[in-house]
Amino acid sequence: MKKGEKVLLALGALLVAAGVFVGVTLGWDYSPNRYAYNDIDFTAAGTAAGECGFVSVRLSDLAVNIYSTTENTVTVAARGAKTPERVSVALDGGVLRITEKRLGLFRRLAASDDDAVIICIPEKWIGTVDAATQSGDVYASGLVSPQLTLRASSESGAVSASELKIAEIQLATTSGDLFVSTIRGGAVTASTTSGYVSLSDAKTENMSLSSVSGNIFVRNAELTGTLTLHSTSGEIDLEDVSAGSIEAGTTSGDLELNEVDTQSLAFTSTSGGISGELLHADEFGGSIHTVSGSVSGVRPKEDGARTLKIETVSGDVDIDG
Protein backbone atom coordinates (compact mmCIF):
# COMPACT_ATOMS: atom_id res chain seq x y z
CA MET A 1 0.00 0.00 0.00
CA LYS A 2 1.32 3.41 -0.94
CA LYS A 3 2.16 5.98 1.69
CA GLY A 4 -0.58 8.38 0.52
CA GLU A 5 -3.24 5.68 0.75
CA LYS A 6 -2.15 4.83 4.30
CA VAL A 7 -2.49 8.47 5.32
CA LEU A 8 -5.99 8.69 3.85
CA LEU A 9 -7.07 5.48 5.60
CA ALA A 10 -5.69 6.75 8.89
CA LEU A 11 -7.52 10.05 8.55
CA GLY A 12 -10.76 8.26 7.69
CA ALA A 13 -10.45 6.04 10.74
CA LEU A 14 -9.84 9.05 12.96
CA LEU A 15 -12.90 10.85 11.59
CA VAL A 16 -15.12 7.81 12.14
CA ALA A 17 -13.82 7.40 15.68
CA ALA A 18 -14.34 11.09 16.41
CA GLY A 19 -17.91 10.92 15.10
CA VAL A 20 -18.74 7.90 17.25
CA PHE A 21 -17.18 9.56 20.30
CA VAL A 22 -19.07 12.83 19.84
CA GLY A 23 -22.35 11.06 19.11
CA VAL A 24 -22.09 8.87 22.19
CA THR A 25 -20.91 11.71 24.41
CA LEU A 26 -23.72 14.06 23.44
CA GLY A 27 -26.39 11.41 23.14
CA TRP A 28 -27.57 12.62 19.74
CA ASP A 29 -30.72 10.96 18.51
CA TYR A 30 -31.58 11.47 14.86
CA SER A 31 -34.92 9.67 15.06
CA PRO A 32 -37.64 12.30 14.44
CA ASN A 33 -40.25 10.40 16.41
CA ARG A 34 -38.03 10.30 19.48
CA TYR A 35 -37.02 13.96 19.61
CA ALA A 36 -38.17 15.48 22.91
CA TYR A 37 -40.78 18.11 22.16
CA ASN A 38 -42.71 17.40 25.35
CA ASP A 39 -42.30 19.67 28.35
CA ILE A 40 -39.75 18.63 30.95
CA ASP A 41 -40.72 19.97 34.37
CA PHE A 42 -38.33 21.84 36.61
CA THR A 43 -39.96 20.53 39.78
CA ALA A 44 -37.91 22.88 41.99
CA ALA A 45 -39.37 25.91 40.20
CA GLY A 46 -42.98 25.27 41.14
CA THR A 47 -43.83 27.91 43.72
CA ALA A 48 -47.06 29.30 45.09
CA ALA A 49 -48.05 32.60 43.51
CA GLY A 50 -47.89 34.37 46.86
CA GLU A 51 -44.24 33.39 47.30
CA CYS A 52 -43.13 34.85 43.97
CA GLY A 53 -43.73 38.44 42.90
CA PHE A 54 -41.05 38.83 40.23
CA VAL A 55 -39.94 36.49 37.44
CA SER A 56 -36.56 37.35 35.92
CA VAL A 57 -35.54 35.56 32.70
CA ARG A 58 -32.09 36.07 31.21
CA LEU A 59 -31.37 33.81 28.24
CA SER A 60 -28.91 33.77 25.36
CA ASP A 61 -29.99 31.52 22.47
CA LEU A 62 -33.03 29.88 24.05
CA ALA A 63 -36.52 31.13 23.29
CA VAL A 64 -39.00 31.83 26.08
CA ASN A 65 -42.77 31.27 25.95
CA ILE A 66 -44.99 32.83 28.62
CA TYR A 67 -48.53 31.55 29.12
CA SER A 68 -51.38 31.77 31.61
CA THR A 69 -52.50 28.96 33.90
CA THR A 70 -55.51 28.39 36.13
CA GLU A 71 -53.25 26.80 38.73
CA ASN A 72 -52.08 28.89 41.70
CA THR A 73 -48.44 28.14 40.97
CA VAL A 74 -45.76 29.75 38.84
CA THR A 75 -44.16 26.90 36.92
CA VAL A 76 -41.20 26.55 34.58
CA ALA A 77 -40.86 23.82 31.98
CA ALA A 78 -38.69 23.12 28.96
CA ARG A 79 -39.05 22.06 25.35
CA GLY A 80 -36.13 20.11 23.97
CA ALA A 81 -34.22 17.14 25.34
CA LYS A 82 -31.15 19.20 26.23
CA THR A 83 -32.91 22.33 27.50
CA PRO A 84 -32.95 21.39 31.23
CA GLU A 85 -29.16 21.07 31.13
CA ARG A 86 -28.91 24.61 29.73
CA VAL A 87 -31.09 26.36 32.30
CA SER A 88 -30.70 27.32 35.94
CA VAL A 89 -33.81 28.06 38.01
CA ALA A 90 -33.74 29.50 41.53
CA LEU A 91 -36.20 31.19 43.89
CA ASP A 92 -34.56 33.88 45.99
CA GLY A 93 -36.46 36.31 48.20
CA GLY A 94 -39.64 36.23 46.11
CA VAL A 95 -37.72 36.51 42.82
CA LEU A 96 -37.76 33.54 40.47
CA ARG A 97 -34.52 33.72 38.45
CA ILE A 98 -34.16 31.78 35.21
CA THR A 99 -30.78 31.96 33.49
CA GLU A 100 -29.05 30.12 30.65
CA LYS A 101 -25.80 28.31 31.31
CA ARG A 102 -22.81 28.66 29.04
CA LEU A 103 -22.45 25.44 27.03
CA GLY A 104 -19.37 23.94 25.46
CA LEU A 105 -18.95 23.80 21.69
CA PHE A 106 -20.25 20.25 21.23
CA ARG A 107 -23.37 20.86 23.32
CA ARG A 108 -24.11 24.06 21.44
CA LEU A 109 -23.90 22.11 18.18
CA ALA A 110 -26.36 19.56 19.56
CA ALA A 111 -28.91 22.20 20.58
CA SER A 112 -32.05 22.72 18.50
CA ASP A 113 -33.55 26.01 17.35
CA ASP A 114 -36.88 24.77 18.76
CA ASP A 115 -35.56 24.54 22.32
CA ALA A 116 -37.42 26.88 24.67
CA VAL A 117 -38.17 27.71 28.28
CA ILE A 118 -41.89 27.71 29.07
CA ILE A 119 -43.26 29.79 31.95
CA CYS A 120 -46.84 29.59 33.21
CA ILE A 121 -48.22 32.52 35.22
CA PRO A 122 -51.38 32.16 37.36
CA GLU A 123 -54.42 34.23 36.46
CA LYS A 124 -54.81 37.38 38.60
CA TRP A 125 -51.15 37.07 39.62
CA ILE A 126 -49.66 40.24 41.12
CA GLY A 127 -46.14 40.99 39.99
CA THR A 128 -43.73 41.52 37.10
CA VAL A 129 -42.39 39.20 34.42
CA ASP A 130 -39.12 40.50 32.98
CA ALA A 131 -37.85 38.33 30.11
CA ALA A 132 -34.76 39.19 28.05
CA THR A 133 -32.81 37.19 25.46
CA GLN A 134 -29.89 37.80 23.14
CA SER A 135 -31.05 35.92 20.05
CA GLY A 136 -33.96 33.80 21.25
CA ASP A 137 -37.57 34.78 20.50
CA VAL A 138 -39.91 35.91 23.26
CA TYR A 139 -43.61 35.00 23.04
CA ALA A 140 -46.31 35.88 25.57
CA SER A 141 -49.96 34.88 25.19
CA GLY A 142 -53.14 34.63 27.24
CA LEU A 143 -51.97 36.52 30.34
CA VAL A 144 -54.87 37.85 32.41
CA SER A 145 -54.22 40.00 35.48
CA PRO A 146 -55.04 43.66 36.22
CA GLN A 147 -51.87 43.92 38.34
CA LEU A 148 -49.34 42.21 36.07
CA THR A 149 -46.54 44.01 34.23
CA LEU A 150 -44.81 42.30 31.30
CA ARG A 151 -41.37 43.42 30.17
CA ALA A 152 -40.04 41.47 27.18
CA SER A 153 -36.94 42.24 25.12
CA SER A 154 -34.46 40.66 22.73
CA GLU A 155 -31.39 41.88 20.89
CA SER A 156 -31.93 39.99 17.62
CA GLY A 157 -34.90 37.74 18.33
CA ALA A 158 -38.55 38.57 17.66
CA VAL A 159 -40.86 39.63 20.50
CA SER A 160 -44.56 38.73 20.24
CA ALA A 161 -47.46 39.45 22.60
CA SER A 162 -51.06 38.39 22.00
CA GLU A 163 -54.34 38.08 23.89
CA LEU A 164 -53.14 40.01 26.92
CA LYS A 165 -55.30 41.72 29.53
CA ILE A 166 -52.78 43.07 31.99
CA ALA A 167 -51.71 46.34 33.61
CA GLU A 168 -48.69 47.23 31.49
CA ILE A 169 -46.77 45.91 28.47
CA GLN A 170 -43.18 46.97 27.70
CA LEU A 171 -41.54 45.44 24.61
CA ALA A 172 -38.15 46.17 23.04
CA THR A 173 -35.73 44.78 20.46
CA THR A 174 -32.57 45.91 18.74
CA SER A 175 -32.89 44.22 15.34
CA GLY A 176 -35.77 41.83 15.98
CA ASP A 177 -39.37 42.52 14.98
CA LEU A 178 -42.22 43.31 17.38
CA PHE A 179 -45.70 41.78 17.01
CA VAL A 180 -48.60 42.84 19.24
CA SER A 181 -52.21 41.70 18.83
CA THR A 182 -55.46 41.46 20.81
CA ILE A 183 -54.56 43.71 23.72
CA ARG A 184 -57.16 44.81 26.25
CA GLY A 185 -56.42 47.48 28.85
CA GLY A 186 -53.10 48.63 30.21
CA ALA A 187 -50.45 50.90 28.75
CA VAL A 188 -48.35 49.61 25.83
CA THR A 189 -44.77 50.66 25.07
CA ALA A 190 -42.86 49.09 22.16
CA SER A 191 -39.52 50.18 20.73
CA THR A 192 -37.01 48.81 18.23
CA THR A 193 -33.90 50.01 16.47
CA SER A 194 -34.03 48.33 13.06
CA GLY A 195 -36.90 45.87 13.39
CA TYR A 196 -40.47 46.72 12.47
CA VAL A 197 -43.45 47.11 14.78
CA SER A 198 -46.80 45.52 13.91
CA LEU A 199 -49.78 46.12 16.20
CA SER A 200 -53.39 45.09 15.65
CA ASP A 201 -56.64 44.71 17.59
CA ALA A 202 -55.84 46.82 20.63
CA LYS A 203 -58.18 48.52 23.08
CA THR A 204 -56.29 50.45 25.70
CA GLU A 205 -55.70 53.93 27.13
CA ASN A 206 -52.22 55.04 26.06
CA MET A 207 -49.71 53.59 23.63
CA SER A 208 -46.16 54.57 22.66
CA LEU A 209 -44.42 53.01 19.63
CA SER A 210 -40.97 53.95 18.37
CA SER A 211 -38.40 52.83 15.81
CA VAL A 212 -35.17 54.16 14.36
CA SER A 213 -35.18 52.64 10.88
CA GLY A 214 -37.96 50.05 11.04
CA ASN A 215 -41.53 50.69 9.92
CA ILE A 216 -44.49 50.97 12.30
CA PHE A 217 -47.88 49.49 11.36
CA VAL A 218 -51.00 49.96 13.51
CA ARG A 219 -54.31 48.33 12.55
CA ASN A 220 -57.68 48.27 14.32
CA ALA A 221 -56.68 50.10 17.49
CA GLU A 222 -58.94 52.02 19.87
CA LEU A 223 -57.36 54.28 22.48
CA THR A 224 -59.09 56.52 24.98
CA GLY A 225 -55.88 58.46 25.59
CA THR A 226 -52.83 59.30 23.49
CA LEU A 227 -51.12 57.36 20.72
CA THR A 228 -47.47 58.43 20.56
CA LEU A 229 -45.40 57.46 17.51
CA HIS A 230 -41.79 58.18 16.65
CA SER A 231 -39.53 57.01 13.85
CA THR A 232 -36.28 58.35 12.44
CA SER A 233 -36.37 56.95 8.90
CA GLY A 234 -39.07 54.29 9.09
CA GLU A 235 -42.61 54.72 7.76
CA ILE A 236 -45.63 55.01 10.06
CA ASP A 237 -48.87 53.52 8.74
CA LEU A 238 -52.18 53.82 10.62
CA GLU A 239 -55.38 52.10 9.52
CA ASP A 240 -58.73 51.99 11.34
CA VAL A 241 -57.31 53.73 14.39
CA SER A 242 -59.11 55.94 16.90
CA ALA A 243 -57.47 57.84 19.75
CA GLY A 244 -58.13 60.86 21.91
CA SER A 245 -54.98 62.39 20.46
CA ILE A 246 -52.14 61.33 18.18
CA GLU A 247 -48.60 62.66 18.51
CA ALA A 248 -46.27 61.56 15.71
CA GLY A 249 -42.75 62.58 14.81
CA THR A 250 -40.23 61.46 12.21
CA THR A 251 -37.01 62.69 10.67
CA SER A 252 -37.46 61.35 7.14
CA GLY A 253 -40.21 58.77 7.51
CA ASP A 254 -43.72 59.36 6.17
CA LEU A 255 -47.01 59.15 8.08
CA GLU A 256 -49.91 57.49 6.24
CA LEU A 257 -53.45 57.75 7.64
CA ASN A 258 -56.32 55.51 6.58
CA GLU A 259 -59.65 55.84 8.42
CA VAL A 260 -58.09 57.50 11.44
CA ASP A 261 -60.34 59.16 14.02
CA THR A 262 -58.87 61.58 16.56
CA GLN A 263 -59.65 64.87 18.24
CA SER A 264 -56.11 66.16 17.86
CA LEU A 265 -53.17 65.32 15.60
CA ALA A 266 -49.66 66.70 16.04
CA PHE A 267 -47.15 65.66 13.36
CA THR A 268 -43.59 66.96 13.15
CA SER A 269 -41.02 65.92 10.56
CA THR A 270 -37.92 67.17 8.79
CA SER A 271 -38.40 65.61 5.36
CA GLY A 272 -41.17 63.10 5.94
CA GLY A 273 -44.62 63.67 4.46
CA ILE A 274 -48.13 63.07 5.76
CA SER A 275 -51.12 61.89 3.75
CA GLY A 276 -54.36 60.00 4.14
CA GLU A 277 -57.89 60.14 5.47
CA LEU A 278 -59.30 61.37 8.74
CA LEU A 279 -62.79 60.50 10.00
CA HIS A 280 -65.03 63.15 11.62
CA ALA A 281 -62.75 65.83 10.23
CA ASP A 282 -65.19 68.56 11.27
CA GLU A 283 -64.22 67.85 14.89
CA PHE A 284 -60.52 67.54 14.15
CA GLY A 285 -57.80 69.97 15.14
CA GLY A 286 -54.08 69.99 15.58
CA SER A 287 -50.83 70.95 13.93
CA ILE A 288 -48.61 69.64 11.14
CA HIS A 289 -45.06 70.89 10.74
CA THR A 290 -42.54 69.67 8.18
CA VAL A 291 -39.43 71.25 6.67
CA SER A 292 -39.39 69.67 3.22
CA GLY A 293 -42.01 66.92 3.46
CA SER A 294 -45.36 67.09 1.66
CA VAL A 295 -48.84 67.35 3.16
CA SER A 296 -51.68 65.73 1.22
CA GLY A 297 -55.36 65.08 1.89
CA VAL A 298 -55.33 65.88 5.62
CA ARG A 299 -57.84 68.63 6.34
CA PRO A 300 -60.84 69.59 8.48
CA LYS A 301 -64.14 70.53 6.86
CA GLU A 302 -64.74 74.20 6.12
CA ASP A 303 -67.38 74.46 8.83
CA GLY A 304 -65.23 72.67 11.39
CA ALA A 305 -65.18 74.12 14.89
CA ARG A 306 -61.48 73.43 15.40
CA THR A 307 -58.31 74.66 13.73
CA LEU A 308 -55.68 72.67 11.84
CA LYS A 309 -52.37 74.48 11.51
CA ILE A 310 -50.07 73.38 8.66
CA GLU A 311 -46.49 74.63 8.35
CA THR A 312 -43.81 73.71 5.83
CA VAL A 313 -40.61 75.34 4.61
CA SER A 314 -40.18 73.83 1.15
CA GLY A 315 -42.65 70.95 1.05
CA ASP A 316 -45.86 70.84 -1.01
CA VAL A 317 -49.32 71.17 0.55
CA ASP A 318 -52.38 69.67 -1.13
CA ILE A 319 -55.37 69.75 1.21
CA ASP A 320 -57.67 68.37 -1.48
CA GLY A 321 -55.75 65.04 -1.37
Regions found by a protein language model. Name each.
Residues L143, V159-L164, E168-I169, L178-G321:
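Short, surface-exposed interaction patches in beta-rich subdomains
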Residues L26-K101, R108-S153, A158-E163, E168, ...:
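Short linear S-[DN]-x-LW-Φ motif typified by the pepsin-like aspartic protease active-site region
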